[in-house]
């Protein structure tokens, strides 16, 4: 599969690393949405990784970012983004801003991204980083992700980047009819669920085994 055009390799040596990441880690494992591939190729993942882990910025593994949190491996970011079925007009809610990498990927595709982070310092760092990269379609909130962000609901897609042991009811309520919820659920044996909301039901489209950090928040008991 051909990749979409990207920036000049000479101007940014990490472009080649992103090209290789997308070909070897993303396309090779079945993610093929052109918008998702273009976003992963465009966003400089190394800008979201601690200085001490720069040599692993484009490796196929999660990395610690402090405060007990991680940046997900590139494949999981791609899988979740593709599963959300985004369009250029989508309004997306992300639970767990973390370092901001997933928010950047979403912002490359969707019209608006609303992201909630419970750890104030992570939220501030992510906002500074994303604004420095020029993103103007991301809205930020420091708060309890379990409760979502009802002010701007409903959302066409909701992505959760930490695992509760059950599906948070507020998120189900804030998902638009026709929208997708992508969420890891469980404690020891987690699965990443892709749920589609219809006018009468919530349908499971697919699920894979995963391991995410636990969801934190006052409503959740952490």
Curated annotation (Swiss-Prot):
A Pfam family the protein falls into: PCMT
GO terms assigned for molecular function: protein-L-isoaspartate (D-aspartate) O-methyltransferase activity
Top-level taxon in the UniProt lineage: Bacteria
Single biological process term from Gene Ontology: methylation
Residues annotated as the enzyme's active site: 72
GO cellular component: cytoplasm
InterPro entries: PCMT, SAM-dependent_MTases_sf
Predominant place of localization: cytoplasm
Disulfide bond listed as a keyword: no
Catalytic activity: [protein]-L-isoaspartate + S-adenosyl-L-methionine = [protein]-L-isoaspartate alpha-methyl ester + S-adenosyl-L-homocysteine
Keywords attached to this entry: Cytoplasm, Methyltransferase, S-adenosyl-L-methionine, Transferase
PROSITE patterns: PCMT
Compartments (UniProt record): Cytoplasm
Entry similarity comment: Belongs to the methyltransferase superfamily. L-isoaspartyl/D-aspartyl protein methyltransferase family.
Purpose of the protein: Catalyzes the methyl esterification of L-isoaspartyl residues in peptides and proteins that result from spontaneous decomposition of normal L-aspartyl and L-asparaginyl residues. It plays a role in the repair and/or degradation of damaged proteins.
Protein name: Protein-L-isoaspartate O-methyltransferase
């Amino acid at each position: 599969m051909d990749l979409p055009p990207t920036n000049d390799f000479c101007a940014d040596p990490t472009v080649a690393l992103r090209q290789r990441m997308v070909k070897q880690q993303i396309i090779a494992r079945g993610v093929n949405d052109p918008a998702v591939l273009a976003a992963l190729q465009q966003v400089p993942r190394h800008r979201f990784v601690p200085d001490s882990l720069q040599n692993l910025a484009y490796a196929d593994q999660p990395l610690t970012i402090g405060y007990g949190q991680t940046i997900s491996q590139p494949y999981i970011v791609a899988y979740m983004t593709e599963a959300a079925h985004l369009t250029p007009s989508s309004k997306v809610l992300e639970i767990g801003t973390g370092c901001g990498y997933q928010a950047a990927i979403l912002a490359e595709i969707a019209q608006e991204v609303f992201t909630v982070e419970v750890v104030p310092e992570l939220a501030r760092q992510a906002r500074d980083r994303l604004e420095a990269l020029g993103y103007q379609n991301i809205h930020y909130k420091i708060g309890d992700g379990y409760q979502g962000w009802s002010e701007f609901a409903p959302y066409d897609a909701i992505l959760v980047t930490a695992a509760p042991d059950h599906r948070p009811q507020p998120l189900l309520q804030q998902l638009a009819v026709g929208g997708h919820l992508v969420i890891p659920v469980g404690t020891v044996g987690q699965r990443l669920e892709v749920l589609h909301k219809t006018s009468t039901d919530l349908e499971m489209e697919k699920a894979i085994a995963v391991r995410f950090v636990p969801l934190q928040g006052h409503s959740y008991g952490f």
